[in-house]
Amino acid sequence: MDKKQLLRNLPKIDELLKEEIINRYLQENSRTLVVDSLRESIDHYRGEILKNNIDSFTKENVVNYFIDTLEENKSTKFKKVINATGVVIHTNLGRSLLAKEAIENVVKVSENYSNLEYDLKEGKRGSRYSHVEELIKKVTGAEAAMVVNNNAAAVMLALNTLCEEREAIVSRGQLVEIGGSFRVPDVMKFSRAHLVEVGTTNRTHLYDYENNINENTGVLLKVHTSNFKIMGFTEEVSSEEMVQLGEKYKLPVMEDIGSGTLVDFSKYGFTYEPTVQSSLEKGVDVVTFSGDKMLGGPQAGIIVGKKKYIDKMKKNQLTRALRIDKMTLAALEGTLKCYIDEKEAIENIPTLNMILSSKDIHKKRAQRLKRRLQNNVKDFNFKVSEDLSMVGGGSMPGERIPTYVVKVNSDKITAEKIEEKLRLSKNPIIVRVSKDEVILDVRTLFERDFNIIVEEFKKLLK
């Protein structure tokens, strides 16, 4: 059939609205939604005809496409996905998962009025920071604390407060890109601090900082390179040395820890990562870090340190533009409460639990998932193998966590096609692919995910 005839055969919306099946959908959905979905279906087939991609179609084809389109239009764009990649803090999949306590706190505060900026004792306006400041001070040992909407904002606010139109001295090897093309030099530029690079990419000495101090110096800045490692012939100035230099010249020392861990992971067999507490104990004046990375909470930028500096930041006009909302505060409060007892934090904060859970636990879980798949899904091969998970989120670069995975392949469908179908399924499942095998890392899976995975695998060859 020629192209013109195919185009003439496209059904009209009014014609389709008379179909019994469409009428059923009209009874359950708004007319606008149904008509828009019908229009999308007709437009789809018109486009396929014009591209010469089809040489025939039926009204039933158009209706079936409409049904899929309607369901897609009804569903939310922000979806739950199942993370089978083994990357714990997966930036593209939302980073850290919240603890149950944090979720309950968010629900309570979001469905009711709250004392967000109301002092119940005094009966007058209060500060939104008061809800978490005492908790942050308790778990970090800081004199004072405040929270903004992300760590880039925390760095910008701190620099703007400490050295607007003055110089911030930083090692050239610490001018990191923190993801999404956001770079420390760019954040500094918008803070109106003047960047002074010292040292080289791999080696920076104390005298590099001292030789560049002048009457216009505002801060000595240290940035933890949490998302990469420089190996070999390297040298960097310790926090203790920078604090001594700052005291000598009466300059504040600021450290951006980035991933912001409150747990010393070296106690559990990992490479040492500086903790917020250790930086403060060494005398660093201002420390900034993220809430949704190693802390395991919501997206937030947390600033801790000397009270005289934090108080100035609270009064900075930028603070209102960068402040966090009540739901983030509620989630952060629920997360921080877990840290009063480290054992409780590891048990209840999903990020910590996933990172620190032993591979033996995951071996048993991988075997359970394999059995369920084998018992319910035909034409696929399943095997349990040792593998390595990642922390992710620009944290612990180079660190790999021993784990167990389920590897999947089939003679009837390629691994790439399996990955695509799982990703586009009603319950999106994100996997890894290696050597024509699909890899399901159980470290980042919950038991509740297993049944969903089995059901989606059943549909792959249909």
UniProtKB/Swiss-Prot annotation:
Its EC number is 2.9.1.1. One of its GO terms (cellular component) is cytoplasm. GO terms for molecular function: L-seryl-tRNA(Sec) selenium transferase activity. The keyword Metal-binding does not apply. Its main location: cytoplasm. Pfam families: Se-cys_synth_N, SelA. It catalyses: L-seryl-tRNA(Sec) + selenophosphate + H(+) = L-selenocysteinyl-tRNA(Sec) + phosphate. It is an enzyme of class 2 (transferase). Its cofactor is pyridoxal 5'-phosphate. GO terms for biological process: conversion of seryl-tRNAsec to selenocys-tRNAsec; selenocysteine incorporation. Pathway: Aminoacyl-tRNA biosynthesis; selenocysteinyl-tRNA(Sec) biosynthesis; selenocysteinyl-tRNA(Sec) from L-seryl-tRNA(Sec) (bacterial route): step 1/1. It comes from the Bacteria. The modification N6-(pyridoxal phosphate)lysine is found at K293. Keywords: Cytoplasm, Protein biosynthesis, Pyridoxal phosphate, Selenium, Transferase. Converts seryl-tRNA(Sec) to selenocysteinyl-tRNA(Sec) required for selenoprotein biosynthesis. This is L-seryl-tRNA(Sec) selenium transferase. The lineage of its organism: Bacteria, Bacillati, Bacillota, Clostridia, Eubacteriales.
